[in-house]
Amino acid sequence: MNAKEFLIELLKFKSVTPNDDGALNFIAMELSDFEAFFIEKEGIKNLLLTKKFKDEGEHLAFGGHVDVVPAGEGWSSDAFVPMEKEGFIYARGAQDMKSGVAAFVDAVKNADFKGARLSLILTSDEEGEAIYGTKAVLEWMQERDMLPDYAVVAEPTCVKKIGDSIKIGRRGSINGKLLIRGKQGHAAYPEKCINPVHDFAPVLKLLAGFDLDPGSAEFSPSKIVITDIRGGMGVCNVTPNDLKLMFNVRNSPDTSLEDVKSYVEKICHGLNYELELKQSSEAFLTNIDNKIVQKMNESVQKITHEVPELNTKGGTSDARYFAKYGVKVVEFGVCNDRIHAIDERVSIEEFEKLCLVFKDLIENF
């Protein structure tokens, strides 16, 4: 089947995370000349497809996920019955990221690769916990001395049109929980209470929106973003016993969890508080002079006639795991204007260009 037909079939699988619903088997059958390793961890199904072309040379990998977020209500048609209309294919996962998977499957089928090994790393655990998927496959590969030299993760990276953006890194993510303790009492007798809202009010303006670093050419500043704040009993005559606050920092490599901890401790000095911090993902950056960045840039410009912005914007992805294992990685895919949305769709023209970009990359790597 051709690339579009393959994408349409792939979109029919109700692979709501972490269930692959048979999508991984379907892909393995399409690439029957590749060695297939089904790697399961904690009930999560992953697939490594790999093919050796020669003994010496470079190992290039493509990474992606077949799991999708739930469809939800309000769709114009069944989210798992792909609908083609006016140059678009509508279905859950059309942009995020079955189009990317279908594109690199088509590319490896049709490209003439001159390197040593091609691999496809696929998971059904990216939209959820994302800890037993790509990470587990890379761990398995490391144990067998099979790690790739370079990787492309086919997440939807483009903003307005195919070719306008390549991700060369990602910010990390640090989650924080702050508990300010007080003493509950009657609002008519504030002198007998310890009101954590009053105590914390001057500190809030030092926390909310604060830039922990100035940013760089590649990364925006590591900003503290308040995501939740609550206290009290929902009544007007009782002061709260404590105040609970949650925040997130999308951090660059210039700001660590320890930096966040140090700043919060400094501004909360004198308060009775508890602080909990967790790094859910780490920042990474692939140098713009690296081969994978240069070759991807060349292929994108050649096929799309766009000059892509090389950036680190957006949330986290499985590319961070490749970077952690020392693999030089970039991300490139279709536009992301409808990801996780009702009536998610992908442009057929964009998808076909993506297939050609990946094919060109493989052949000229």
From Swiss-Prot:
Its EC number is 3.5.1.18. PROSITE patterns: ARGE_DAPE_CPG2_1, ARGE_DAPE_CPG2_2. GO terms for molecular function: acetylornithine deacetylase activity; metal ion binding; succinyl-diaminopimelate desuccinylase activity. It catalyses: N-succinyl-(2S,6S)-2,6-diaminopimelate + H2O = (2S,6S)-2,6-diaminopimelate + succinate. The keyword Ligase does not apply. The active site is at D67, E126. Zn(2+) 2 binds at D96, E127, H340. Its cofactor is Zn(2+); Co(2+). Signal peptide: none annotated. Zn(2+) 1 binds at H65, D96, E155. Transmembrane segments: none annotated. Homodimer. Catalyzes the hydrolysis of N-succinyl-L,L-diaminopimelic acid (SDAP), forming succinate and LL-2,6-diaminopimelate (DAP), an intermediate involved in the bacterial biosynthesis of lysine and meso-diaminopimelic acid, an essential component of bacterial cell walls. Belongs to the peptidase M20A family. DapE subfamily. This is Succinyl-diaminopimelate desuccinylase. It comes from Campylobacter jejuni (strain RM1221).
